[in-house]
Amino acid sequence: MLILTRRVGETLMIGDEVTVTVLGVKGNQVRIGVNAPKEVSVHREEIYQRIQSEKAGNSSEGGNF
């Protein structure tokens, strides 16, 4: 895992097209902004895991109609 230190307003690049900017820090929360092309999905981890489990549940149903 790469660990970086950034200040508010500073940005990091992921590849050529994705930027992550630190927007603010308040207590133990960090607000970040992600700028990515439309074809790149960006989700919070808990939302991504829910999407993946729903996909797994739908594919295991086998399409019985």
Curated annotation (Swiss-Prot):
It is found in: Cytoplasm. GO terms for biological process: mRNA catabolic process; negative regulation of translational initiation; positive regulation of translational initiation; regulation of carbohydrate metabolic process. One of its GO terms (molecular function) is mRNA 5'-UTR binding. It holds the Pfam family CsrA. One of its GO terms (cellular component) is cytosol. Keywords: Activator, Cytoplasm, Repressor, RNA-binding, Translation regulation. Its main location: cytoplasm. Gene3D superfamilies: Translational regulator CsrA (2.60.40.4380). InterPro entries: CsrA, CsrA_sf. The keyword Manganese does not apply. A key translational regulator that binds mRNA to regulate translation initiation and/or mRNA stability. Mediates global changes in gene expression, shifting from rapid growth to stress survival by linking envelope stress, the stringent response and the catabolite repression systems. Usually binds in the 5'-UTR; binding at or near the Shine-Dalgarno sequence prevents ribosome-binding, repressing translation, binding elsewhere in the 5'-UTR can activate translation and/or stabilize the mRNA. Its function is antagonized by small RNA(s). HAMAP family: CsrA. Belongs to the CsrA/RsmA family. NCBIfam families: csrA (TIGR00202), PRK01712.1 (NF002469). Homodimer; the beta-strands of each monomer intercalate to form a hydrophobic core, while the alpha-helices form wings that extend away from the core. This is Translational regulator CsrA. It comes from Shewanella woodyi (strain ATCC 51908 / MS32).
